């Protein structure tokens, strides 16, 4: 008896510590980004159409990541894609959840996840299906260096 009983002074110290030291994650423990500002998540058809129309008349490369919450390989690819989006700042990266916007996924005649589609001037120029990071980076290099 008494092993789990704290004195009033000990309770004050814990309460005082909690009130004066707000918790913040330390970068060495949490090095990942919770929400990548480099990849825009498209959540509805209007957002998709406006993004596509805005880039039709530019030479900017649009990289579309088709994903789903239940897709294991998609989750494997996500951190690498965020790295690439941070590296290739001149490229527009968007993410589309196929469960939310199935019609967009079907426009591209896709059947496998993850799928990455490359577009320039409103038309599809290439794609990568599956977790093929080397191929993805090679194509990013190819389309960011070429102009047409």
UniProtKB/Swiss-Prot annotation:
Site annotation Contributes to redox potential value: residues: 72-73
Question: Where this protein primarily resides, as one coarse class?
Answer: cytoplasm
Where it sits in the cell: the answer is: Cytoplasm
In terms of InterPro entries, this protein maps to: Thioredoxin-like_sf (IPR036249), Thioredoxin_CS (IPR017937), Thioredoxin_domain (IPR013766), Thioredoxin_H-type-like (IPR050620)
Disulphides = 71-74
Active site residues per record:
71, 74
Keywords noted in UniProt: Cytoplasm, Disulfide bond, Electron transport, Redox-active center, Transport
Give start and end of each Thioredoxin domain.
Answer: 1-145
User: Which Gene3D superfamilies does the record cross-reference, listed alphabetically?
Assistant: Glutaredoxin
> Which GO cellular component terms are attached?
cytoplasm
What Pfam families does this protein map onto? Thioredoxin
User: Any idea what job this protein has?
Assistant: Probable thiol-disulfide oxidoreductase that may be involved in the redox regulation of a number of cytosolic enzymes.
Q: Which family does it belong to?
A: Belongs to the thioredoxin family. Plant H-type subfamily.
- What is the protein name for this chain? Thioredoxin H8
